[in-house]
């Protein structure tokens, strides 16, 4: 096996029945490609469906729900262990609510084969409902602002663009790509410890992409590949639990990566001394995280004043859990990173607050954002 395409399923039997046949057909002629379903202890008959309608597809059935992060980590570990010397070179994480197009996989394999510096790549993500329009979760590749707010080429806040090929000829490198469909180099995934299981679900792919870049790899979008995403297959957009995960995990992601990123900026542009750069990077990261938490507090007040009490509580609980779960920033770890950081570049971090730029300055499409406003690390 060269490429393992893995659906992590939890109670999405209907999506499997609808979209799995097309996925199987799409990779049938690709040598070394195998579709695998890992089930997170579903209670809707998903495993029975696999046994009865798709006996040719390998199914890994977990006894409990490990979440998106733990489920994929455990699935990949089992696949690698069973494969032995034939372990896959690439893993594809793909949601059950994805409809693939013909020839979606080949361009990604070709890109990864010819670009060993690429740690992960993804197709363009279109809406399943509006097929000429980007989909919220990933569009044409993700960026992030200096406070950790993600946005995309083709989607800023809630404004989603039609795909008219406007981003097809841009530099394919982005900051993150959606976990709805993400091809990762298995060796890199393993070296980085996989997905951070503290996240459970949501934002974990952005954290992984950030860690890949800090390890010297790039993240790319492949415009010759397009898939169609239903979205909200596991948690609806209005779910307070989803809101909780997004707020908490964004802070965990900043805690994981921001100090190293700022220290790299100081080290490369101002002070080639690891200890000074590490101190300044940690100070800047801690200040940014405090500012982000104040911003979250403002959004919590908006929820309260608009009588969205469950959303208000979700933000408060997210901050409480973050304080319990954060690892903290270790100066020695940052210094060790800097000593081994030659050639590492972090791109596509927007130097302004994207929420303010969108709401006050009407920057609702990615083309309206100036390239000079991105940090150069």
Regions found by a protein language model. Give the residues of each.
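Active-site-adjacent helix/loop segment of glycosyltransferases
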Residues: 6, 215-335, 343
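Short, acidic, metal-binding catalytic loop of nucleotide-sugar glycosyltransferases
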Residues: 21-32
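A conserved acidic beta->alpha catalytic loop
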Residues: 22, 39-48, 64
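Short beta-strand/loop segment that forms part of the nucleotide-sugar
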Residues: 32-41, 60-62
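Glycine-rich, basic loop-to-helix element that forms the pyrophosphate-binding segment
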Residues: 62-83, 107
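Short beta-strand-to-loop acidic/aromatic patch adjacent to the donor-nucleotide binding site
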Residues: 86-99
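Conserved donor NDP-sugar-binding/catalytic core segment of glycosyltransferases
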Residues: 98-149
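A short, conserved alpha-helix in the catalytic core of glycosyltransferases
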Residues: 167-226
């Amino acid at each position: 096996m060269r490429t393992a395409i893995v659906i992590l399923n939890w109670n999405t039997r209907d999506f499997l029945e609808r979209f799995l046949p097309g996925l199987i057909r799409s990779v049938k002629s690709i040598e070394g490609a195998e579709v695998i379903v890992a089930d997170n202890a579903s209670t809707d008959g998903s495993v029975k469906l696999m046994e009865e309608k798709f006996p040719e597809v390998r199914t890994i059935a977990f006894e409990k729900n490990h979440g998106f992060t733990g489920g994929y980590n455990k699935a990949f570990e089992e696949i690698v262990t069973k494969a032995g010397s034939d372990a896959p070179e690439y893993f594809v994480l793909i949601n059950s609510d994805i409809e693939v197009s013909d020839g979606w996989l080949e361009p990604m394999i070709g890109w990864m084969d010819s670009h060993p510096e690429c740690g992960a790549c993804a197709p363009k993500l279109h809406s399943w409902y509006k097929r000429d329009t980007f989909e919220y979760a990933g569009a044409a590749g993700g960026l992030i602002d200096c406070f950790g707010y993600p946005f995309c080429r083709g989607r800023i806040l809630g404004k989603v663009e039609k795909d008219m090929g406007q981003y097809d000829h841009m530099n394919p490198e982005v900051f993150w790509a959606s976990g709805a469909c993400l091809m990762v180099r298995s060796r890199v995934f393993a070296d980085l410890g996989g997905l951070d299981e503290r996240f459970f679900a949501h934002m974990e792919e952005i954290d992984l992409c950030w860690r890949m870049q800090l390890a010297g790899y790039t993240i790319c979008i492949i415009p010759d590949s397009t898939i169609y995403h239903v979205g909200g297959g596991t948690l609806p957009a209005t779910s307070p639990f989803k809101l909780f995960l997004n707020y908490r995990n964004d802070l965990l992601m900043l805690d994981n990566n921001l100090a190293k990123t700022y220290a790299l900026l100081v080290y490369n542009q101002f002070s080639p001394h690891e200890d000074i750069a590490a101190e300044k990077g940690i100070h800047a990261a801690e200040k940014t995280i405090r500012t982000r938490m104040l911003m979250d507090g403002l959004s919590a007040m908006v929820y309260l004043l608009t009588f969205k009490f469950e959303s208000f509580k979700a933000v408060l609980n997210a901050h409480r859990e973050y304080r319990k779960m954060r690892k903290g920033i270790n100066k020695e770890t940052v210094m060790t990173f800097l000593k081994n950081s030659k050639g590492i570049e972090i791109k596509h971090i927007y130097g302004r607050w994207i929420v303010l730029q969108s709401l006050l300055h009407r920057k609702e499409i990615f083309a309206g954002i100036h390239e000079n406003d991105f940090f150069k690390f």
